[in-house]
Amino acid sequence: MEPQLAEFVLKEEMTCQCPKMSDGAYDMDVDQNYFEEEVRLASFANFPSSYPVSAPALARAGFYYTGDGDRVKCFSCLAMVEGWQHGDTAIGKHRKISPNCKFINGFNNLRSDCILTQVPVMQNGFQNSAEDLAERSSSEIMADYLLRTGRVVDMSTPKYPRHMEMCSEEARLQTFQNWPAYSPLTPKELANAGLFYTGINDQVKCFCCGGKLMNWEPSDKAWTEHKKHFPECYFVLGRDVGNVATEANTHGGRRRGSELACPAMNDYNARLETFSSWSFPIDKETLAKAGFYSIGDGDATKCFHCGGVLNCWSATDDPWEEHAKAYPGCKFLIDEKGQHFINHAQLKRPILHKANSADASPALPKDSNLLKSPLVTDAQQMGFPLEEIKKVMGQKLKTTGKNYTCVEEFVSDLCAQKETVLEKPKEIEISLEEKLRQLEEEKICKVCMDRRISIVFIPCGHLVACAVCADVLDKCPICCTIVERRQKIFMS
């Protein structure tokens, strides 16, 4: 099997057409004074708190405050927006009024502290020639320096995925109608690995990165070859690029982050209407803003996007914070509040929402029945004690009224519980920033020291490697136990 190299691509500077812009012409250059999110956020010092969209959400969406009413301006496309209404989201509004804005188009995959640049984009390892570099202006050279030092992110790379029409695994599978019979790999395996058939010999292409592969051999594995030749592919790295797996590959119904749990509750007013008979101490409007709607069972609420359920609310609870503690991966939450907010909320764990009383936990099944569960068997094979398993299952039932349905979520909560137990209460107070740094270091792969840990080795149960490194390890780097199986988990 051989990779097909992509060609050199030079991206042109974007043009932005916004239906709701300030009068008159504007400079196409970005406002470099506000390309850092912290600077944009500082501009909202006098922003009225009564407005329906929060300052952090606006700053994260690329806006800074103009000082006039609720009017904000994008540092990148220079679009101005005002007249914010309940139910508006900063990112959604930005995309609607300025669909060509480079910053907002790259929002899902890139950092927010960026500026627009017009630099050549290299694909699959191609380098600039000396002639290309000699012709570049001083501003382009400065932009390249900023990119290399990590201060900004190049927004000129094309939006992922490259082939939106092939996001569905079923759609990719349909392209293999004339797949050559001599190929040793099945269409199902290739489609599952993000590849679709180009119609040329045995050549396939990734819907996300656009990488091409051909000349397959009997010993080849679709996922392995995809990772080997295109290791930077966002789909291979496990990022949410909109892939829609077939029902057989959804791992017990686990939903991708780009899909809504309840599309009918996408609108703020629709969520607010569900609280018509609400009599509990927490403000229903605040709950609706945080993405929750009432499910009609006491004070139980559910997020329209991630499907997370929270109950037992008190008057002092912050719905946004509780959302971040319990369901940090919710894309609506990330878009609205930002990763910094979520990280700080996570430091205030326990993640699980407060119950009304200590004895409010539903009874667990007896040990004999509990041990029959495949989830419990897998967890015990990873080295988790039965007492910890019972405790985490009880907390899950207390919080949601339901038990675990997929091993990834179960193992993730078990790991979080283990970290909490191992904490030393006598440690000296550490600043939030230091705790955050330590938390990030704990989640880094101990092999490459770059990507995040995501694979549990079985049977030893050690969680120390990312998906890329774990794929090439036959023995656990901690205890040298031979790896019989690898289980991917999703860390909160």
Curated annotation (Swiss-Prot):
<keyword id="KW-0863">Zinc-finger</keyword>
<dbReference type="GO" id="GO:0043066">
    <property type="term" value="P:negative regulation of apoptotic process"/>
</dbReference>
<keyword id="KW-0808">Transferase</keyword>
<feature type="binding site">
    <location>
        <position position="330"/>
    </location>
    <ligand>
        <name>Zn(2+)</name>
    </ligand>
</feature>
<comment type="subunit">
    <text>Monomer, and homodimer.</text>
</comment>
<protein>
    <recommendedName>
        <fullName>E3 ubiquitin-protein ligase XIAP</fullName>
        <ecNumber>2.3.2.27</ecNumber>
    </recommendedName>
</protein>
<keyword id="KW-0879">Wnt signaling pathway</keyword>
<dbReference type="InterPro" id="IPR001370">
    <property type="entry name" value="BIR_rpt"/>
</dbReference>
<dbReference type="GO" id="GO:1902530">
    <property type="term" value="P:positive regulation of protein linear polyubiquitination"/>
</dbReference>
<dbReference type="GO" id="GO:0045861">
    <property type="term" value="P:negative regulation of proteolysis"/>
</dbReference>
<comment type="similarity">
    <text>Belongs to the IAP family.</text>
</comment>
<feature type="binding site">
    <location>
        <position position="303"/>
    </location>
    <ligand>
        <name>Zn(2+)</name>
    </ligand>
</feature>
<keyword id="KW-0862">Zinc</keyword>
<dbReference type="InterPro" id="IPR013083">
    <property type="entry name" value="Znf_RING/FYVE/PHD"/>
</dbReference>
<dbReference type="GO" id="GO:0005737">
    <property type="term" value="C:cytoplasm"/>
</dbReference>
<feature type="repeat" description="BIR 2">
    <location>
        <begin position="172"/>
        <end position="237"/>
    </location>
</feature>
<feature type="repeat" description="BIR 3">
    <location>
        <begin position="271"/>
        <end position="334"/>
    </location>
</feature>
<feature type="repeat" description="BIR 1">
    <location>
        <begin position="40"/>
        <end position="105"/>
    </location>
</feature>
<keyword id="KW-0789">Thiol protease inhibitor</keyword>
<keyword id="KW-0833">Ubl conjugation pathway</keyword>
<dbReference type="GO" id="GO:0008270">
    <property type="term" value="F:zinc ion binding"/>
</dbReference>
<dbReference type="InterPro" id="IPR001841">
    <property type="entry name" value="Znf_RING"/>
</dbReference>
<dbReference type="GO" id="GO:0043123">
    <property type="term" value="P:positive regulation of canonical NF-kappaB signal transduction"/>
</dbReference>
<dbReference type="GO" id="GO:0004869">
    <property type="term" value="F:cysteine-type endopeptidase inhibitor activity"/>
</dbReference>
<dbReference type="GO" id="GO:0004842">
    <property type="term" value="F:ubiquitin-protein transferase activity"/>
</dbReference>
<keyword id="KW-0646">Protease inhibitor</keyword>
<dbReference type="GO" id="GO:0070431">
    <property type="term" value="P:nucleotide-binding oligomerization domain containing 2 signaling pathway"/>
</dbReference>
<dbReference type="InterPro" id="IPR050784">
    <property type="entry name" value="IAP"/>
</dbReference>
<keyword id="KW-0479">Metal-binding</keyword>
<feature type="binding site">
    <location>
        <position position="306"/>
    </location>
    <ligand>
        <name>Zn(2+)</name>
    </ligand>
</feature>
<dbReference type="GO" id="GO:0006915">
    <property type="term" value="P:apoptotic process"/>
</dbReference>
<keyword id="KW-0963">Cytoplasm</keyword>
<dbReference type="Pfam" id="PF00653">
    <property type="entry name" value="BIR"/>
</dbReference>
<dbReference type="Pfam" id="PF13920">
    <property type="entry name" value="zf-C3HC4_3"/>
</dbReference>
<comment type="function">
    <text>Multi-functional protein which regulates not only caspases and apoptosis, but also acts as an E3 ubiquitin-protein ligase mediating ubiquitination and subsequent proteasomal degradation of its target proteins. Acts as a direct caspase inhibitor. E3 ubiquitin-protein ligase that acts as an important regulator of innate immunity by mediating 'Lys-63'-linked polyubiquitination of ripk2 downstream of NOD1 and NOD2, thereby transforming ripk2 into a scaffolding protein for downstream effectors, ultimately leading to activation of the NF-kappa-B and MAP kinases signaling.</text>
</comment>
<dbReference type="GO" id="GO:0043027">
    <property type="term" value="F:cysteine-type endopeptidase inhibitor activity involved in apoptotic process"/>
</dbReference>
<keyword id="KW-0677">Repeat</keyword>
<keyword id="KW-0217">Developmental protein</keyword>
<feature type="zinc finger region" description="RING-type">
    <location>
        <begin position="445"/>
        <end position="480"/>
    </location>
</feature>
<feature type="binding site">
    <location>
        <position position="323"/>
    </location>
    <ligand>
        <name>Zn(2+)</name>
    </ligand>
</feature>
<keyword id="KW-0053">Apoptosis</keyword>
<dbReference type="GO" id="GO:0016055">
    <property type="term" value="P:Wnt signaling pathway"/>
</dbReference>
